[in-house]
Amino acid sequence: MARIAGVNIPTAKRVVIALTYIHGIGPKFAQEIVEKVGIPAERRVHQLTDAEVLQIREAIDRDYQVEGDLRRETAMNIKRLMDLGCYRGLRHRRGLPVRGQRTHTNARTRKGPAKAIAGKKK
């Protein structure tokens, strides 16, 4: 199993698909990386040489922010919004939808399971 950016990549899958197992690399970026390095798209991970794995690793380290760094930056951006006290930060702090969705009904994923309220029986 090849290890790229701290993630064990599945060996039986095509390289483009396997790279999407890394947080921060989706299908588009995976295709770009494979084209930059010059690996055929049909090649499977177990068919890669050590030199090709090293090239992929270097291309990712050089051009993309992935895994821990990306998670840390995302968390810092959310923390910054919360510290500013702006509307988006308040929504994050309260655990409500941030992007304008309705909350009267729905939004259960963000708000958590429904809470019973005393005196609401019919």
UniProtKB/Swiss-Prot annotation:
GO cellular component terms, A-Z: cytosol; small ribosomal subunit
Annotated InterPro entries: Rbsml_uS13_C, Ribosomal_uS13, Ribosomal_uS13-like_H2TH, Ribosomal_uS13_bac-type, Ribosomal_uS13_CS
GO molecular function: rRNA binding; structural constituent of ribosome; tRNA binding
Amino-acid biosynthesis is among the record's keywords: no
Top-rank lineage group of the source organism: Bacteria
Chloroplast found in the keyword field: no
Region of interest (Disordered), ranges: 99-122
Alphabetized Gene3D superfamilies for the sequence: 1.10.8.50, 30s ribosomal protein s13, domain 2
Any GO BP: translation
Keywords, ordered alphabetically: Ribonucleoprotein, Ribosomal protein, RNA-binding, rRNA-binding, tRNA-binding
PANTHER family: 30S RIBOSOMAL PROTEIN S13/40S RIBOSOMAL PROTEIN S18, SMALL RIBOSOMAL SUBUNIT PROTEIN US13M
Subunit structure: Part of the 30S ribosomal subunit. Forms a loose heterodimer with protein S19. Forms two bridges to the 50S subunit in the 70S ribosome.
Role this protein plays: Located at the top of the head of the 30S subunit, it contacts several helices of the 16S rRNA. In the 70S ribosome it contacts the 23S rRNA (bridge B1a) and protein L5 of the 50S subunit (bridge B1b), connecting the 2 subunits; these bridges are implicated in subunit movement. Contacts the tRNAs in the A and P-sites.
Similarity-based family: Belongs to the universal ribosomal protein uS13 family.
HAMAP family attached to this UniProt entry: Ribosomal_uS13 (MF_01315)
Protein name, per record: Small ribosomal subunit protein uS13
Organism: Rhizobium etli (strain CIAT 652)
Gene encoding the protein: rpsM
